[in-house]
Amino acid sequence: MGIKKEHVVVCLGASIMRGQVSSNFVGDLEARMGKDGFRFINHAVAGYEAYNVLVNLDATIDIQPDYVIILVGTNDVTASLSPGVSRISRLMKKIPEPHSTAFYRKNMSQIVHKLKKSTMARIGIVSLPVLGEDLETTPNLRIREYNAVLKDIANREQVSYLPVYEQQEAYLKQNQDHAGREYRGGVKTSLVMLIRHFLFRQSFDTISKKNGYTLLTDGIHLNSRGAKFIADEIELFLREDE
């Protein structure tokens, strides 16, 4: 029996990709695909924006992975929704420009350019998940604007676009008989979620149900159902060459 070739997959992003305060779909992918030679390296860092991924990209390039999966931008969006959050974010994360779709486009384009120039990796860009579950509120309208940027970059650069938002949107429309709970900003719901999970050992699914969400836990992070959409899209992308 021949030895299976190892496929190294680097995952870039923030807390949703990191999977510590959100359902761990990278761990799920390891369980699904590890036996087939896929090795996942999670370089995501909670709080990162696209700019932070860009300036720390050399660590990924040094690995020379076979695949790179990028899911980053939710923090860019939440900062763009609030001048106060934007100011704090720029100060704490050393973001050099105001938050905008143009700044996001510049950073994401440079990430893809640098990866294409310095590696042979196949690149998958994951569309940003829903932000709150009322699809017609400003947060989700903004998410769709940022996802349009991602889709355009993917088309221009001939890399793969993984339509997670689109799948989640379709699921919510099919399974909700009224508008879902909206994302209101602020940190209270997220802090309570963290206390419930890490102090009282409640699962993300239990917290999600108590908070009245279908795919999310606190309006941003994912329960297991929400995370499965991402895992499924990534697995589909990774298995295309098999």
What is each stretch, according to the model?
Residues 1-67:
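Serine-esterase "nucleophile elbow" of acetyl-processing enzymes
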Residues 2-5, 35-36, 52-242:
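Alpha-helical cap/lid subdomain in secreted, periplasmic
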